[in-house]
UniProtKB/Swiss-Prot annotation:
Record bears the keyword Transferase: yes
Upper classification of the organism: Bacteria, Bacillati, Bacillota, Bacilli, Bacillales
Name of the protein in its database record: Thiamine-phosphate synthase
GO cellular component: cytoplasm
InterPro entries named among the record's database cross-references: Aldolase_TIM, ThiamineP_synth_sf, ThiamineP_synth_TenI, TMP_synthase
NCBIfam families: thiE
GO molecular-function term, one example from the UniProt record: magnesium ion binding
Amino acid sequence: MRDFRLYAITGEEFHPDRSLQAVMEEAILGGVDIIQLRDKKSHKREVLEKARVLQALAKKYDIPLIINDHIDVALAVDADGIHLGQDDLPLSEARKIMGRDKIIGISTHKIEEAREAEKGGADYIGVGPIFETKSKEDVVDPVTTAYIQQVAHEISIPFVAIGGIKLHNVEQVLDAGATRICMISEIVGAEDVKGTCEVFSTILEQRGIGS
């Protein structure tokens, strides 16, 4: 898979007065180089329509679109991949359905899950939540930057840090060994989405982390 550094996940509850397309396009223009549609509440047809909108956007800017959990929607819009949680469809089954050419990401909260995901053939893993977060319901306790250090030392596939990452603490995340960061509310809930992403992009560039 193509490498990435700044990952944005949808969260429409954080921008009720702005369209999904407008917010995500601003994020891309600010430096986001991979996007994920995450929608646990809408009816399937609505999720499909959102996926079509985002797929058109992803193609326009030549970046990957990942669909969270909805493997049928991912197939329907020919998304670049899917992202699965620990309680979602098993990685081995998802790979049979998606094929070898699609991206499969797995959320992990401890090193044993990271090892299992790598062994099972995941293309990347999510590492988190690093800090407390209100963007996801039923979220596990923060894993802290210590987990980033573990993964950076032991896991060879790409990993992305997620969970409560903000401008005031992102340096801690990078200091721990992360080279890819992912956010929901800090990006899509920002007053200036493009400007916020540009700041994160600059921080990454100053660290020598290219897109």
